[in-house]
Swiss-Prot record:
GO BP term, example: vitamin K biosynthetic process
Coiled coil spans: none
Matches recorded under InterPro entries: MenA, UbiA_prenyltransferase, UbiA_sf, UBIAD1
Domain of life of the source: Bacteria
Protein name in UniProt: 1,4-dihydroxy-2-naphthoate octaprenyltransferase
Species of the source: Bacillus subtilis (strain 168)
Family from the record: Belongs to the MenA family. Type 1 subfamily.
Location of this chain's protein in the cell: Cell membrane
């Protein structure tokens, strides 16, 4: 008599390849927080100089490697502090799900910083060595976000640091290395991107409220509660779009920048997703919509600038 194996007819879950594991470690849905500011700062520079493509690429990949390193430090230190489990949502999961050694994650983070430094040397040699100081401070903040005795991620200031460092600063450095200057227009253009990068961080913290409470964190989302944090997220989206209206009305930017309003469905989707759900797993779509808001907003802002440049 033939015996039927338990679970026969069910498809066994496929084991992820090392490439897939490493890709998830980078937290790819967050990487637009680096790409968008660099693109925007470079497009704005076109109004003043002929853009150096190699400098643009060096800046882009340097910023990406810094962000990847920050995400890896996050993975390492959250595990070390006992915050990550196999059931945790939104993590790379290389340690708790795939058995990768914590030491390997730390080595990958340091290697990512090493690549960023090499690219930074080229950027500084082509522009200004003062940027080396800014870069080192940025990398220190990336490490201290989850490392050190009082990680930034454990405080209410995570959104502020990420918004300024990965939003405004990335835009301004990208503009500076092409033009050798920072002006009021570049500062004003960088503000909505800073707000939206901070919003990505806020959306992560909204999802992680309960887990972060257990880990002793005091994030802005925890202090405000789910409803208050979602209200702040919605207000952040609104301010970013209103800021563009202000730039156009005051003559600081072309009316073509109104093209950013084509991205409005994404923040609406994000806010609805957070309002309707409080379970971490059910907030993934809302989180992705928040990241996509930054992506689409930044791309459309760049397109608006490009159209006004060529007209």
């Amino acid at each position: 008599m033939n015996q039927t194996n338990k679970g026969e007819g069910q498809t066994a879950p496929q084991k992820e390849s090392m490439g897939q594991i490493l890709w998830q470690l980078t937290r790819p849905h967050t990487l637009t927080a680096s790409f968008v500011p660099v693109l925007l700062g470079t497009v704005l520079a076109m109004f003043y100089v002929k853009v150096d493509l190699l400098l643009f690429l060096a800046m882009l990949f340097s910023c990406l490697w810094i962000q990847i390193a920050t995400n890896l430090f996050n993975e390492y230190y959250d595990f070390k502090r006992g915050l990550d489990t196999a059931e945790s949502v939104g993590i790379g999961g290389a340690i708790v799900r795939h058995g990768m050694k914590p030491k390997t994650i730390l080595q990958l983070a340091l290697a990512s910083y090493g690549i960023a430094i090499l690219l930074g040397v080229y950027i500084c040699a082509s522009s200004s060595w003062w940027l080396a100081l800014i870069g080192l401070v940025g990398m220190a903040i990336g490490y201290l976000y989850t490392g050190g005795p009082l990680p930034i991620a454990y405080t209410p200031f995570g959104e502020l640091f990420s918004g300024i460092c990965m939003g405004s600063v990335f835009v301004l450095i990208s503009f500076f290395i092409q033009t050798d200057k920072i002006n009021m227009q570049s500062i004003l253009i960088s503000i909505p991107i800073a707000i939206l990068v901070g919003a990505i961080n806020l959306s992560n913290n909204i999802r992680d409220i309960e887990e972060d409470k257990k880990g002793g964190r005091k994030t802005l989302a925890i202090l405000m509660g789910h409803k208050g944090a979602v209200t702040l997220l919605a207000a952040s989206f609104a301010v970013a779009y209103i800021w563009v209206v202000g730039l156009v009305i005051t003559g600081a930017a072309s009316p073509w920048l109104f093209v950013v309003f084509l991205s409005v469905p994404k923040p609406v989707q994000a806010v609805k997703g957070f309002v309707q759900n409080e379970m971490p797993m059910n907030m993934i779509v809302a989180m992705k919509s928040t990241a996509q808001t930054n992506t689409f907003f930044g791309f459309l802002l760049s397109i608006g600038l490009l159209i006004s440049y060529f007209r």
